[in-house]
UniProtKB/Swiss-Prot annotation:
SS bond list: none
Region (Disordered): 214-239
Record-level GO BP terms: translation
Function as written in the Swiss-Prot or TrEMBL entry: Binds the lower part of the 30S subunit head. Binds mRNA in the 70S ribosome, positioning it for translation.
Record protein name field: Small ribosomal subunit protein uS3
Gene it is expressed from: rpsC
Family: Belongs to the universal ribosomal protein uS3 family.
Organism listed in the record: Methylocella silvestris (strain DSM 15510 / CIP 108128 / LMG 27833 / NCIMB 13906 / BL2)
SUPFAM superfamilies found in the cross-reference section: Prokaryotic type KH domain (KH-domain type II), Ribosomal protein S3 C-terminal domain
A single Gene Ontology CC term: cytosolic small ribosomal subunit
Length: 239
């Protein structure tokens, strides 16, 4: 099942958290959920050139805090903050709450799965060869510290008559390991021949903070100087 399910959804509550962080009663829940979906769709459409990775929505008391993670924060903010005021007004039309906008810069867009997928989609729309686009993305991600990456491209690649799926993988991408930090992103390239789907998995290493077995092992290694040498020495002294 790890091969089929969305890796982010599988890890929610383990090493990932939700993009919508609020609580509502059953009367309000549906309304707020639809608000979130409308806000995200509008912002993604408005900020198409800003390389938006994700949008986090939090709702403290009578407020709506929207945090935009972008690789190009300057495009979001605009000259002297003009564009951010437009975004605030756009979001304010969709919700009754007071709107707060935060911008967070994505430092390494090459290892953000959503941004990698969007980049490949844009290249396919510009008629760049799909193999070259995939290979370039894989090399950039591995160079910037990813432990593994897998990219799937499916559709009428290169204008072929029959749709097919092509994929590249480098390093390891453990989809079943729940403590693995696996980022996942998708995008659609609307080419002259039809739509092509892009899926990207990026493995950034294992998160061991919440793993009691890993913590016990780490403590044992610190106590014994990082190996079994001390134990062997004690056994020899006792003999």
């Amino acid at each position: 099942m790890g091969q089929k399910v969305n890796p982010i959804g599988l890890r929610l509550g383990i090493n990932r958290t939700w993009d919508s962080r609020w609580f509502a009663g059953k009367n309000e829940y549906g309304k707020l959920l639809h608000e979130d979906m409308a806000i995200r769709a509008a912002l993604m459409k408005t900020l198409k050139q800003a390389a938006v990775s994700k949008i986090i929505i939090e709702r403290p008391h009578k407020k709506c805090r929207v945090t935009i993670h972008s690789a190009r924060p300057g495009v979001v903010i605009g000259k002297k903050g003009a564009d951010i005021d437009k975004i605030r007004k756009l979001v304010a039309k969709m919700t009754d709450s007071e709107v707060l906008i935060n911008i967070v810069e994505v430092r390494k867009p090459e290892i953000d799965a959503t941004l990698v997928a969007d980049s490949i989609a844009q290249q396919l729309e510009r008629r760049v060869a799909f193999r070259r686009a995939m290979k370039r993305a894989v090399q950039s991600a591995m160079r910037l510290g990813a432990e593994g990456i897998r990219i799937n491209c499916s559709g009428r690649l290169g204008g072929a008559e029959i749709a097919r799926l092509e994929w590249y993988r480098e390093g390891r991408v453990p989809l079943h390991t729940l403590r693995a930090d696996v980022d996942y992103g998708t995008a659609t390239a609307h080419t002259a021949y039809g739509a092509c789907g892009i899926k990207v998995w990026i493995f950034k290493g294992e998160i061991l903070e919440h793993d009691p077995m890993a913590q016990d092992k780490k403590m044992a290694e610190q106590d014994h100087g990082g190996g079994g040498g001390d134990r062997r020495r004690r056994d020899r002294d006792a003999a």
